[in-house]
Structure formats: structure tokens, C-alpha cells
Amino acid sequence: MKAYQRKLDIRNGCVDLSHGSGGRAMAQLISGLFHEAFGNEWLARGNDQSAFDVRAGRMVMTTDGYVVSPLFFPGGNIGSLAVHGTVNDIAMAGAKPLYLSASFIIEEGFRFADLKLIAESMGAAAREADVHIITGDTKVVERGKADGLFISTAGVGVVPDGLDLSAEKARVGDRVLISGTLGDHGVAIMSKRQNLAFETEIVSDSASLHDLVARMVQAGGRGIRLMRDPTRGGLAATLNEIAQQSNLGFHLLEEAIPVKPGVAAACELLGLDPLHVANEGKLVAIVAPEAAGAVLAAMRAHPLGRDAADIGEAVADDHHFVQMATSFGGGRIVDWLSGEQLPRIC
């Protein structure tokens, strides 16, 4: 039987419907592009699934979809974002990420060159996070039926013994820690989407937080009540969600919340509130007061936590409000975002 040609015309070629048909062209795409980008022992077996060994203990699993527009943005692209976002969802349980799956829905006519860049960035992000993309799927839809490329992922990880992070564990007096500046990702996406040029380029904060989380857990142990990554809806949505789940409220100090000057200026120009803008490389931790100092020091000692800050505390509040003392000496309620401020941000 004649072997199929594995070589794709990466420079000039485009995806067509045959690349999702299950035939020779699809085999070329998988072997010549995805396997080269993600290559590992599991994918090399060519099965429709991947088997892996697990040790006794608690596992976590997550799933996510990525429809960001534009596909390429300052600081990353949909591929690196898909890995970072999935790894971070696992890491917020204090877990070590292990394995990912990735499914691609590709629009007919999508350039191989762009797909290769995206796949390579996924592979690089996975290697950096010490995770493996061990199974996946590819579908191709007609022109006009998708906006270039959508990615769906799933991931699994293992939780360290004795660690159980949950909003139910939050208590009055717990400190609210943020790992760095807010709004970088959302403003980077919006500036690229609207072709806005600022004096200082605003770059997405998209990054995998697993190593930062491991350092925090080592420093704070069971003093860490829970962690969340403030993605869509930003810090405001995250803290409102935690307030509802924990039956508490939060008091924040605006002056303590880190926002880069360029991001603050861009938000003012665009009519955005940094507290509502998405982040893809930050986390919020609710930490017992006796552990907060050690956890904050561990965060600041890590490259992804240099701008970490203690921004407030958990309080008793039957209404579960998130309130903030403003820099002008007043106060305001930080509510959920109403409507859609930044669509297709991740």
C-alpha cells in the first residue's frame, strides 16, 4: 500500500475540508503539524485515547473553551492561552497539572502557517508547565461557519495530600491577596482588536501559575483557604462569587490594588474598570491572617508574583457585598459586571 505524503505546504497551504474528513489529508495534518508540535510517547501511539497511570489520592479535572479574538495578541495567542488557562484552573485547587487534551475546530481556509505557530506555542507552553498534551481531535467546518479557529481543552491534575481548598473554608478576618497587576490581558486584547497604539505597549499577562501556587502552598499550607484566577469578569466577579459561596463579604482598599499606569490610562480612555477586566496570569488567594505574611513573601519572591499585594479582608456581611475604600476617601460597592464589557476575551 502506498504511504501517504507527510509533508504539508506550511508556507503557502491552507486547511480545507479534506483535513477533517478522516482520510489521508487529515493524517497528514495530524502527523505533520500537531505531532511535531506536541510530540510525546502518548501521541506517538496513534490511539483515539491515551492511558496513563495515577497514584492513589485526589485528582482534579477541568475543561475549557477558547474563542479569543484576535487569535494573536501581544504576549501570546489562542494556543498558549489555552494551555495557560487550563493549567491555571487545575492549579487553583493547589494541584499539580499532569495531562491535557486539545480539540481544534478549524475554519476552511485557515493558513497552515498560522496553525503551526499556534500549535508550536501550545507545545512550548505545555513543556514550560511540565504537562503533556496526550490526546486530541480535529474538525474542519466550512468557510463562514467559524471565526478561524476555536480550541477546547480538558486537563487533569493531582492534589497534594492534606490540601482541600474551598470557599466554604473562608473565615472573617482572612486576607485577600492578589498576585500582581490587574487588567493586563483584557486591555491587551482590546487594544489589538481596536488597533489602538499606546505610548507603552500593553502585553497580556497570560502565564501558567502552577509553580507560583506550589511555592504558596509550601509557605502557607492549610492557611490558604482557596485560590481563584480572575479571568472573565475580573477581580470583581471573582470576589463576588467567593462572597456568595462563603457567606461573607469583602472590604478592599483601592490604593493597595496594583494596576500598571499604562493599563489604568487605557481603561480610562476605553471606559473600562480595571476591576472588571480579565486577567490570564493572576490569582486571588484568601488566606488566614496568621499565614498571610509568609504566603505574600513567597509570592513576591516568584517572578509571576513580584507585584503581589494584600488588598483587603473578609468580613461578616449578610448581604455578601464586596466593598472598597476609594483613594478619594469614600467608598463604593464593587458589584458584578452587568452585561458584556469585553466579549471573546479568552
Curated annotation (Swiss-Prot):
* Reaction(s) this enzyme catalyzes, per UniProt: C-terminal S-carboxamide-L-cysteinyl-[HypE protein] + ATP = C-terminal S-cyanate-L-cysteinyl-[HypE protein] + ADP + phosphate + H(+)
List, in alphabetical order, the GO biological process terms annotated in this UniProt record. Answer: protein maturation
| Pathway stated in the Swiss-Prot or TrEMBL entry | Protein modification; [NiFe] hydrogenase maturation
Q: Does the keyword Isomerase apply?
A: no
CDD domains linked:
HypE
Q: Which InterPro entries match?
A: HypE (IPR011854), PurM-like_C_dom (IPR010918), PurM-like_C_sf (IPR036676), PurM-like_N (IPR016188), PurM-like_N_sf (IPR036921)
Q: Which residues carry this modification: S-carbamoylcysteine?
A: 346
The catalytic activity of this protein is classed by the Enzyme Commission as 4.2.1.-
**GO MF terms held by the record:** lyase activity
Positions bearing S-cyanocysteine: 346
The transmembrane segments are none
Modification after translation, per record: Modified by HypF, which adds a carboxamido group to the thiolate of the C-terminal cysteine, yielding a protein-S-carboxamide. The carboxamido group is then dehydrated by HypE itself to yield a protein-thiocyanate.
Q: Is this entry keyworded Lyase? A: yes
Name the keywords, alphabetized: Lyase
Report the domain of life of the source organism.
Answer: Bacteria
Describe its function: Involved in the maturation of [NiFe] hydrogenases. Along with HypF, it catalyzes the synthesis of the CN ligands of the active site iron of [NiFe]-hydrogenases. HypE catalyzes the ATP-dependent dehydration of the carboxamido group attached to its C-terminal cysteine to a cyano group.
Family according to the record:
Belongs to the HypE family.
User: What is the recorded name of this protein?
Assistant: Carbamoyl dehydratase HypE
